[in-house]
Regions:
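Generic structural signal for small/hydrophobic residues in well-ordered secondary structure
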Residues: 5-6, 44, 77, 102
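Active-site neighborhoods of divalent-metal-dependent phosphate/nucleic-acid chemistry enzymes
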Residues: 64-112
Length: 129
């Protein structure tokens, strides 16, 4: 499983998005490994402006598996946030929650967002991130 973060979806959906990121997302989709979580879905819907983007989102909802955010995910997110803060690293809470979701489900996280690199620098590679 590869949890695709909003940052990578944005590159994938834009004609001028980073070609390497677009290729990684495309490969995950073609292999059937791509998934998302409720936070990513919300962020994408929040940015969907026109009819075309909304149509794409409805299609994504139909075909892309969603990783649940459970009570365990929330506890893990709180621990990741605590570890980051203790190390002097401040990252958005939504990114911490997405990282926790990937870790809980054993999914690799596909992203184009430096904040996930900061989280990894604190917590290491114990589980995919």
């Amino acid at each position: 499983m590869i949890l695709i973060d909003t940052s990578s979806w944005i590159h994938f959906l834009r004609a001028d998005g980073d070609a390497i990121v677009r290729q990684r997302v495309d490969a995950a989709l073609r292999s059937g490994a791509a998934c998302w979580c409720p936070v990513v879905r919300l962020e994408l819907w929040n940015g969907a402006a026109g009819a075309r983007e909304k149509k794409v989102m409805r299609e994504f909802e139909r075909v892309i598996p969603e990783l649940a955010i459970s009570a365990i995910t929330w506890r893990l997110a709180c621990e990741l946030a605590r570890l980051c803060r203790a190390a002097g690293v401040t990252v958005p809470a939504t990114d911490v929650l997405i990282a926790a979701c990937a870790r809980e489900h054993g999914a690799r996280l596909e992203h184009a967002d430096h904040d996930f690199d900061l989280i990894r620098s604190v917590v290491g590679d114990e589980a995919p991130l």
